Regions:
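Catalytic/RNA-binding core of pseudouridine synthases
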Residues: 1-231
């Protein structure tokens, strides 16, 4: 007998909560809809929140288009401490005494705008030699990683009451690591940095205002995943 075809098809726009992997979200939605064929477009780090585009049933075939879309994030960048994960979930591995102002931070952000080269962080799902980088990192090892070209079309910064914590809004191509961008900004200013409170507010044509919770977000028509495509 052939495999039973899925009976649930569509798109779901989730506001991913902190503390869950993108796969955790998929697992919960599989239980909710009783459907195995569920996938997501664009992985979010466990501590990150925001837009996660989900395809259910036959809609999974269209996820590659959503995955390739630009993303927009809001994030806080903490200057001074470097961590092994490049975000606040990691262990501090270096401390830098830094003093920065708006002109300096804006200029450094501008230098990281446009087409740039990024080296994937060790704690990431990228594969090297057939293994996930985070698996290698868990063994306490670091390996060489090839840089890749990404495009940052917007990198806006603003100060907060804390002179070493800055807010940023970033619009970038798929595959851009915001953790790496924050660390590179710290390096460009002669020190170090890590990020916290990362939130994806837009994924392609889908905004965070359209999202819902894992339990309550509605199943949308498959055609939602063709939004913005050329006719």
């Amino acid at each position: 007998m052939g495999r039973k075809p899925p009976v649930v098809h569509g798109a779901v726009l989730i506001d991913k909560p902190a503390g869950m992997t993108s796969h955790d979200v998929v697992a919960q939605l599989r239980k909710r809809f009783g459907e195995r064929r569920i996938g997501h477009a664009g992985t979010l780090d466990p501590d990150a929140t925001g837009v996660l585009v989900i395809g259910v049933g036959n809609a999974t075939r269209l996820l590659r288009f959503a995955s390739a879309s630009n993303k927009t994030y809001e994030v806080e960048i903490v200057f001074g401490p470097e961590t092994d994960t490049l975000d606040s979930s990691g262990q501090v591995v270096a401390e830098h005494h830094m003093s920065v102002d708006l002109e300096q931070v804006s200029a450094a952000a501008a230098s990281l705008t446009g087409e740039i080269e990024q080296v994937p962080p060790m704690v990431s799902a990228r594969r090297v030699g057939g293994r996930r980088l985070y698996e290698i990192a868990r063994e306490g090892r670091e390996v060489d990683r090839e840089s890749r070209s990404v495009t940052v079309s917007r990198f806006e910064v603003e100060a907060t009451e804390d002179p070493l914590i800055w807010r940023a809004k970033v619009t970038c191509s798929a595959g851009t690591y915001i953790r790496t961008l924050g660390a590179d900004l710290g390096s460009a200013l002669g020190g170090g940095a890590h990020i916290r409170n990362l939130r994806r507010i837009r994924s392609g044509h889908y905004s965070v205002e359209e999202t819902g919770t894992i339990d309550e977000a509605p199943l949308l028509p498959i055609l939602e995943l063709t939004r913005g495509m050329d006719p």
